[in-house]
Amino acid sequence: MRLLIPILIFALITTAVTWFYGRDDPDRWSVGGVWPLPKKIVYGSKNRTITYDKIGIDLGDKKDCDILLSMADNYMNKWLFPFPVEMKTGGTEDFIITVTVKDECPSGPPVHGASEEYLLRVSLTEAVINAQTVWGALRAMESLSHLVFYDHKSQEYQIRTVEIFDKPRFPVRGIMIDSSRHFLSVNVIKRQLEIMSMNKLNVLHWHLVDSESFPYTSVKFPELHGVGAYSPRHVYSREDIADVIAFARLRGIRVIPEFDLPGHTSSWRGRKGFLTECFDEKGVETFLPNLVDPMNEANFDFISEFLEEVTETFPDQFLHLGGDEVSDYIVECWERNKKIRKFMEEKGFGNDTVLLENYFFEKLYKIVENLKLKRKPIFWQEVFDNNIPDPNAVIHIWKGNTHEEIYEQVKNITSQNFPVIVSACWYLNYIKYGADWRDEIRGTAPSNSRYYYCDPTNFNGTVAQKELVWGGIAAIWGELVDNTNIEARLWPRASAAAERLWSPAEKTQRAEDAWPRMHELRCRLVSRGYRIQPNNNPDYCPFEFDEPPATKTEL
């Protein structure tokens, strides 16, 4: 009876903790759980012990493919055995991961709609990956790494046996970073690309420039970054950009640049005559104009030449040209500008600044159409809401205070046969105390929480409309985000969007079912050396994150 009393007391305490936090014990997580959840997964009943000296990867006839060689190096030397434990050797038979890819090794980055489908079978003797493309093989290898866990009782690495068939639900699954409000170093961007690949995300939307700064280095127009960058150190050279694109390619990620026009352009002031003069209500000229001058015909020649350079720098077939929040600056920069008003009268626009916007956008559409390296434009949704959109455009949705309002936006735009990308569900720069990936957080717009539950096709529309939903991009705007906090603020909150955009909707209805796998994902990424914040109330990881020793930045 004496032994029974402490056991009962412990049970009561455990129950109280569970009730207090509304969760099970903080050490509840999956073992060898795959994130995002595969389309079909069947686990075996036994696990296999693996050691780093007895495991190998056979790339078959693709042994010279740089993408697969990089993959093999990363997983063999880092990601398969991430935990800080003494590595055992010997004692097991060789375990070979055989990778078979049908298509040839591509020389460039992935293209929109490229297959990421794969088959993965792990037995007690081997692992076999089959994929149409190298991109599918990358996704399969990441899933395989999720099957590996450290058994604390036996002090061994083990891998779960499994059969997986998997492919993404949407072709566009991304992260948007903002390097204008706060400059993000190339190394920090690369770290986010690595974590993106570990969540099977495939698009980096790079919001390069905005009103605050112009860190993009233009060879043809050096006055842009010369005047618009925060300092000569806060710029991305052509080599930096090529480095990011190459790094992303090896991880199956496309890089889509954004150059927002005609608003958010104060940092373009190095180009004389590019911006309109803006005035306050007393008619006094303001210090920082923020709209392109549509009267100056030379500005369109400049935009054409500048975008030609951009397309030579960024190989992706899409080009994001912004178009948002023009109305924020219209009164100050167009309506109060006497020259603009006279120009509008001459063009027959009267006082309708929407017609002036359309005039600008129609010229921009023609510029894009005539680019030597063809690109499909992406615009923020105001270009659809307020203007005459380019019939070839993709519309990027960022508005809506509730999931229902967002769904209505998607329904409206797809009804006009425009493809859409949704970001409104996942504005991760908004933070509030609580587990916002799953719960509705008071004090924020409802759309700025419950990230796991926002489904871009959850509207009453036709099959054709829902096929026009290309996916989503989780956005982290940079007003209060820089190198020091972007990683923890993004992850694992962006992982909720990653599963929503990859996994079957019918299998991912409850965050309650997902959180043990997300907890294992968080701890896995922490062990890999990333700053992944807690996401499920008080808990712990077997191996906690530890900051490396500080070093003095070279001046």
UniProtKB/Swiss-Prot annotation:
Signal peptide bounds: 1-18
Q: Which UniProt keywords apply?
A: Glycoprotein, Glycosidase, Hydrolase, Lysosome, Signal
The UniProt catalytic activity note for this protein reads: Hydrolysis of terminal non-reducing N-acetyl-D-hexosamine residues in N-acetyl-beta-D-hexosaminides
- Write out the catalytic residues in the record: 325 (proton donor)
Tissue specificity remark: Expressed in coelomocytes and neurons of the pharyngeal region and nerve cord.
KO phenotype (gene knockout): Worms show reduced degradation of p-nitrophenyl-beta-N-acetylglucosaminide and no chitotriosidase activity.
| Database matches in CDD domains | GH20_HexA_HexB-like
Per the record, the domain of life is Eukaryota
Listed under GO cellular component are: lysosome; membrane
Q: Where is it mainly found?
A: other
Read off the Pfam families from this record.
Answer: Glyco_hydro_20, Glycohydro_20b2
BP terms from Gene Ontology: carbohydrate metabolic process; glycosaminoglycan metabolic process; N-glycan processing
Family matches, as InterPro entries: Beta_hexosaminidase_sua/sub, Glyco_hydro_20_cat, Glycoside_hydrolase_SF, Hex-like_dom2, HEX_eukaryotic_N
Localization, UniProt: Lysosome
The record describes the dependence of activity on pH as: Optimum pH is 5.5.
Q: What is its EC number?
A: 3.2.1.52
Q: Name one GO molecular function term.
A: hexosaminidase activity
Which SUPFAM superfamilies does the UniProt entry name for this protein? (Trans)glycosidases, beta-N-acetylhexosaminidase-like domain
Residues annotated as glycosylated are: 47, 351, 412, 460
The family line of this record is: Belongs to the glycosyl hydrolase 20 family.
- Function in brief: Responsible for the degradation of GM2 gangliosides, and a variety of other molecules containing terminal N-acetyl hexosamines. Degrades chitotriose.
PANTHER family in UniProt: BETA-HEXOSAMINIDASE, BETA-HEXOSAMINIDASE A
Name recorded for this polypeptide: Beta-hexosaminidase A
